[in-house]
Regions:
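Two-component/phosphorelay signaling modules centered on CheY-like receiver
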Residues: 11-29, 118
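Short hydrophobic/Thr-rich beta-strand motif most characteristic of the beta2 strand and flanking loop
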Residues: 25-32, 40, 102
Length: 123
């Protein structure tokens, strides 16, 4: 079974994302920040990360860089999600190693379809 991790410091946002993708029927982990996410991911590899950019302790950019540097996580897919919609924020996300970038508020149907496509599920 493929594993998904939702990384966001806001509990309500994690709950929203979990509700959107729960029908995909995958194991879903949660983390409040990049440090916690990395610790959990190194214990049980993650196939797909949904990562907020602005978080305490370790932001999404740094987390993405750490994921790309770890052999056991390097092939994971990363969707960066941010309230920032400026072109330079999106470019920085991709330079950090993100595969996809979405601006908040996230379109729930687009997120569900994207996650399904990434994991090879029909949605």
């Amino acid at each position: 079974m493929k594993n998904i991790m939702i990384v966001d410091d806001a509990t309500t946002v994690r709950m929203f994302h979990k509700g959107v993708i729960s029908s995909i029927n995958r194991h879903i982990e949660e983390a409040e920040n990049g440090v916690e996410a990395l610790e959990k991911a190194l214990k049980a590899p993650i196939d797909l990360f949904l990562v907020d950019i602005n978080m305490p302790k370790m932001d999404g950019y740094r987390l993405c860089q750490e994921i790309r540097q770890r052999d056991e996580l390097r092939t994971s897919t990363v969707i960066m999600i941010s309230t920032e919609s400026a072109k330079q924020d999106e470019e920085r996300a991709y330079r950090s190693g993100a595969n996809f970038y979405m601006s908040k508020p996230v379109d729930s149907e687009k997120l569900k379809v994207l996650v399904g496509v990434i994991l090879g599920d029909a949605v």
